[in-house]
Amino acid sequence: MIQPQTHLNVADNSGARELMCIRIIGASNHRYAHIGDVIVAVIKEAVPNMPLERSEVIRAVIVRTCKELRRDNGMIIRYDDNAAVVIDQEGNPKGTRVFGAIARELRQLNFTKIVSLAPEVL
């Protein structure tokens, strides 16, 4: 469960290292974001000499959460960290690589480009 002021790791090579959620995109009554939700975030830590800089406001999609994700078949998936991938306005990732495992639910939410870049899909 990601809410405003939550810090997240970045799971791609876009140049950002850590994000802080400032808004959840979608219905106005969304209190928490889960895997596959798009958020507005600010970059808290960035890699030097990269296009993305600190204090820049960007969009990102949640790919891993510490909160359990329950699937329809009863399986429960939980990750060790909260992580997101930086995306542009069209939903395409800004980086060219994705690090770590991501959930299969992203494919159903039309983030197929992120799924194809990921080394492992759970």
From Swiss-Prot:
Compartments where located: Plastid, Chloroplast
Any single Gene Ontology cellular-component annotation: cytosolic large ribosomal subunit
Chief location category: plastid
Gene Ontology terms for molecular function: large ribosomal subunit rRNA binding; structural constituent of ribosome
Transmembrane feature ranges: none
Keyword presence, Aminoacyl-tRNA synthetase: no
InterPro entries linked to this entry: Ribosomal_uL14 (IPR000218), Ribosomal_uL14_bac-type (IPR005745), Ribosomal_uL14_CS (IPR019972), Ribosomal_uL14_sf (IPR036853)
Disulfide bonds: none
UniProt entry keywords in alphabetical sequence: Chloroplast, Plastid, Ribonucleoprotein, Ribosomal protein, RNA-binding, rRNA-binding
UniProt key word Transferase: no
GO terms for biological process, alphabetical: translation
Listed SMART domains: Ribosomal_L14
Pfam assignment, any one: Ribosomal_L14
Database matches in Gene3D superfamilies: Ribosomal protein L14
Oligomeric form and interacting partners: Part of the 50S ribosomal subunit.
Its job: Binds to 23S rRNA.
UniProt family annotation: Belongs to the universal ribosomal protein uL14 family.
Protein name: Large ribosomal subunit protein uL14c
Native organism: Liriodendron tulipifera (Tuliptree)
